[in-house]
From Swiss-Prot:
One term of GO molecular function: transcription coregulator activity
Intracellular or extracellular location(s): Nucleus
Major localization class: nucleus
Name the record gives this protein: Mediator of RNA polymerase II transcription subunit 22b
Protein role: Component of the Mediator complex, a coactivator involved in the regulated transcription of nearly all RNA polymerase II-dependent genes. Mediator functions as a bridge to convey information from gene-specific regulatory proteins to the basal RNA polymerase II transcription machinery. The Mediator complex, having a compact conformation in its free form, is recruited to promoters by direct interactions with regulatory proteins and serves for the assembly of a functional preinitiation complex with RNA polymerase II and the general transcription factors.
GO BP term, example: regulation of transcription by RNA polymerase II
GO annotation, cellular component aspect: mediator complex
UniProt keyword tRNA-binding, yes or no: no
Keyword terms: Coiled coil, Nucleus, Transcription, Transcription regulation
Organism name: Arabidopsis thaliana (Mouse-ear cress)
Coiled-coil ranges per UniProt: 102-141
InterPro entries in alphabetical order: Med22
Subunit structure: Component of the Mediator complex.
Length: 154
């Protein structure tokens, strides 16, 4: 999972929603890995038992018991395989939805950064306008009080 941000905007803090989300993601990852381990172990154990039970023996009663055991083990293998398929589907959905969530978070972060840049730019433009206005007033006062202007008007 991609939890790293882009070029940061300077808002600090190592805790909060991001740390909580990372802890929740780690916990979910551990639970999913445990499910995978359990299901794979079940498939392997049941397959091993089917192979062990499938040896042909003489008494018909024992053969029917072994057949029942094989069917039971095969059923457990199918259940474990079904659980693995559901897990894969859940992982795909999680990847899709967490991808959208992290994308939305990134978009919101970028919007906030651009809003801050727009504010900074507006303040800079206002300061430049104030400076230009003050300089223009100063130039006008020098022009109207200068001796050269008086000689040009005569």
């Amino acid at each position: 999972m991609n939890k790293g941000g882009g070029s940061g905007g300077g808002s600090g803090g190592g805790s909060g929603p991001t740390a909580a989300a990372a802890a929740a993601a780690l916990q979910k990852q551990k639970a999913l890995l445990q499910r995978v381990e359990t299901d794979i172990t079940s498939v392997v154990d049941n397959f091993t038992q089917i192979v062990n039970v499938s040896r042909v023996s003489d008494p018909p009663v024992k053969n029917s018991q072994e057949t029942y055991m094989m069917e039971m083990r095969a059923s457990r293998m199918v259940q474990a395989a079904d659980s693995l398929l559901k897990l894969v589907s859940e992982l795909k959905q999680t990847a899709i939805f967490s991808g959208f969530a992290s994308l939305n978070d990134h978009v919101e972060q970028r919007i906030e950064e651009f809003d801050q840049e727009a504010e900074k730019t507006n303040r800079l433009l206002a300061r430049i306008a104030d400076d230009a206005s003050a300089n223009l007033k100063e130039l006008e006062s020098h022009y109207y009080s200068s001796a050269q202007r008086l000689t040009l008007d005569i």
